[in-house]
Amino acid sequence: MQPVVETLSGLERRVDLAVSVAEVEKEVQAQLKRVGRTAKVAGFRPGKAPLAMLERSHGPGIRYDVINSLVGRAFEQAVDGAKLRVAGSPTLTPKTEGVADDTLAFTATFEVYPEVTVPDLSALAVTRYDTPVTDAEVNQTLDVLRKQRAKFETREGRASQDGDRVVLDFAGTIDGVPFEGGKAEDFPFVLGQGRMLPEFEEAALGLKAGESKVFPLKFPDDYQGKEVAGKTAEFTVTVKEVAEGVLPEVDAEFAKSLGQAEGDVEKLKADIRTNIEREVKARLQGRTKGSVMDALVEAGKFDVPKALVDSDVEGRIAAAREELKQRGVPNADSVPMPAEVFSTESERRVRLGLLVSELVKQAQLQAKPEQVRARIEEFAQNYEQPAQVVSYYLADRQRRAEIEAIVLEDNVVAHVLENAKVADEKVPFDQLMGMA
């Protein structure tokens, strides 16, 4: 008789399972005999140990495995018969009351996948972002490259300006007490690069060699040095050297220094434009995809299996700990990481994954081989040997699967943009690139 699956609440289900003791013992004896053919028992030749002795040494482990296997098979038959898709693993609880001596009974509690309804795409409001790349962006990038290759020349009597390198001594106190990291001598940095806190750079601006200044500085609340975060220090700086940054001319020598073998400045600019356009395209795609996915998640109203959310949380915690280890953080495995910190985002990820999967199935948006190859070739342009990168990705199943997942998401985004209410929005170049 087919077991009856009960609905508890939401996606949670329950079913009672039973296996006969006789079936368990029959399988246990069969496995003991198989083990006995090769088992090495002291005092006996291989295969000659008494079954009773094998029962004592191997019986408990074999019996445990057999019961798990038979109960698992009964569970699969029950959910298959009810045509259910199980999310995660069931929780099994032994039953004793009202159970015959010749039967082992269990209650399996589990979750099922929800019925996912793709929202009406025509009702979704999404944003498609765009950033034009002009000569101004190319020239701006050229300026950045020139500043990175600046040569600094000491200028006597020069008041420091943005772009100058200053060498100074500094000492800071909090409530009159020195603190760790608050003092240095012959400390160099370039004004305007954002390496130092804004108040510190502002204090050093306009000073000449030999001049000093005393000023207050409030550390941000989220400052990396937790012992001083949110506190106000008093700093004294003394400038010892001011060096002006002399930028290289944009000429053949400069072009060659950036890998343009011919020293052709116009070809260098064309290469820079190509690289900028590639980076801009990737960032715009990311922003637009974010808008599309946010709209899908917001419109997708259905329960998600807690088992899948918990699994995602565990994966993200493991990844976070691994990242801490890579950064050299001591005792990374014992750093507190409460599950609730990750649960909201994990629920969103699970919901989005179910929605995308259903949308791909309904609209037949699977990644095509030619799309995957085109995306790999595009990605390979970031490397010096693109052809080798393409061959590597095509030959490696795992790497290829990663690109297939990206292409699949691209197809989903394109499909939503074709059907949703789309608002086009220009993003300033500096903002897109995180320079503003």
Swiss-Prot record:
Residues 163-248 form the PPIase FKBP-type domain. Its EC number is 5.2.1.8. It comes from Bordetella parapertussis (strain 12822 / ATCC BAA-587 / NCTC 13253). Its main location: cytoplasm. Pfam families: FKBP_C, Trigger_C, Trigger_N. Gene3D superfamilies: 3.10.50.40, Trigger factor ribosome-binding domain, Trigger factor, C-terminal domain. Belongs to the FKBP-type PPIase family. Tig subfamily. Consists of 3 domains; the N-terminus binds the ribosome, the middle domain has PPIase activity, while the C-terminus has intrinsic chaperone activity on its own. Keywords: Cell cycle, Cell division, Chaperone, Cytoplasm, Isomerase, Rotamase. This is Trigger factor. One of its GO terms (cellular component) is cytoplasm. InterPro entries: PPIase_dom_sf, PPIase_FKBP_dom, Trig_fac, Trigger_fac_C, Trigger_fac_C_sf, Trigger_fac_ribosome-bd_bac, Trigger_fac_ribosome-bd_sf, Trigger_fact/SurA_dom_sf.
